[in-house]
């Protein structure tokens, strides 16, 4: 069975910092966060494609810091997503999100679990504090370690996102970040080149 993501963009919503490399509105092609109606339309519109192709999909909230968005809005989106994973488990087999390491705590993980979240990707980008500071990330490598531990302990599929070529980055820093990602025992890694 093939697996894919149905990406739902919440461009820059929930982000507390403007990182040196980021303009989610340009990257995603979306200028406003998705509404519940738009989410329903996206998921409804993909059902036949998924059935016909025999593909399963995770509903993926990307392009912002999902766990830092307005709590009521987040729960409304999760309610819609859970309705589809419950009603169409052969097509929608999970919910995933990306977020910042400093926006993870036990309370938010409990909420995500109760609404059927299955996977969390942390936008770590680097495990070097000098690189993180130079790129205005607003979190530290220790925040990544702490959030990673909490996510793993809570039983989610756990992914890390790495960016190569950031300001102040070096080949050795990238190698060190990769080694630390391995040590954190993540299930997946996304590696992005920095393009400005």
Predicted regions, residues:
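N-terminal pre-triad scaffold of radical SAM enzymes
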Residues: 1-28, 47-67, 96-100, 117-119, ...
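Short microdomains enriched in Cys/His and/or Lys/Arg
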Residues: 37-50
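Radical SAM enzyme [4Fe-4S]-AdoMet core and its adjacent flexible, acidic
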Residues: 193-196
């Amino acid at each position: 069975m093939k697996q894919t993501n149905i990406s739902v963009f919440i461009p820059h919503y929930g982000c507390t910092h403007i990182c040196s490399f980021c303009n989610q509105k340009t990257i995603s092609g979306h200028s406003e966060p998705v509404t519940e109606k738009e989410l329903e339309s996206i998921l409804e519109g993909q059902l036949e494609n998924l059935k016909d192709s025999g593909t399963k999909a995770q509903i993926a909230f990307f392009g912002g810091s999902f766990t830092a968005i307005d709590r009521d809005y987040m729960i409304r989106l999760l309610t819609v997503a859970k309705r589809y994973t419950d009603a169409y488990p052969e097509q929608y087999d999970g919910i995933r999100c990306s977020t910042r390491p400093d926006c993870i705590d036990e309370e938010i993980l409990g909420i995500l679990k109760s609404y059927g979240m299955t996977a969390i990707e942390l936008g770590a980008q680097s495990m070097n504090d000098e690189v993180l500071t130079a790129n205005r990330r607003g979190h530290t490598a220790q925040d990544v370690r702490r959030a990673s531990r909490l996510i793993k302990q809570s039983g989610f599929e756990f992914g890390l996102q790495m960016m190569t070529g950031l300001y102040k980055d070096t080949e050795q820093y990238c190698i060190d970040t990769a080694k630390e990602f391995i040590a954190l025992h993540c299930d997946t890694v996304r590696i992005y080149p920095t393009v400005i």
